Amino acid sequence: MRRVEHWVRQPGPESRHSLHWLAIAVSFALLLTWSEGLTQTYGLLRDPVEVVKKYVSLDQRGIRLESISWETIRPYVNWKEEPSWGHVMVTVGYKIVDDIKQWEVISMMEVLIPVEYQVLGAVYLEAPGFLPEKQVERVKFRVKAVGGRWRIIEPLLPPHVGQKRMINYVRQAMLQELEPSRLAILTALRDELQKAK
């Protein structure tokens, strides 16, 4: 019995200290892995069209109208920052082609997914105004595997916001506007957006 005790290492202050740091390192690694999983769940086992659906849906709801919302779309795209746009495309709908036969497959890790926007026109932000330009805009979103997740690589388009959301955005600006001449411009813009078909 004495021989066995001789070979068993007794816990001392050094081993407790090492164990403490090991526990902290493991906890930190788990926390990082867990938080990355929360911010983006579009791993390579999922369908790449899901990233496009989520991004286009958020854009339609006006998430890109405010720069503070950048963190919301960051998990879906590969660009580092959202540029400031001088205009916003106003839409009445969109259609995402989710049939893989209609995609352009570049490789196993890269595809082009078509989206059709029903555009009413554009709202220019500097001197608020609506330029009607009814059209169907066809865009191919390049989705690629980046860091083990699907990300939109391009195109970097101006915001494509739904008509109702854009009207509400202008209404909110009207409530915050104190200058009468600017309020008149925003009122005219709201009226134009409401009439657009």
Region annotations inferred by a language model:
Residues 1-16:
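N-terminal secretory signal peptides that target proteins for export/translocation
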Residues 23-33:
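Bacterial N-terminal signal peptides
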Residues 32-42:
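Bacterial Sec-dependent signal peptides at the C-terminal "C-region" and cleavage site
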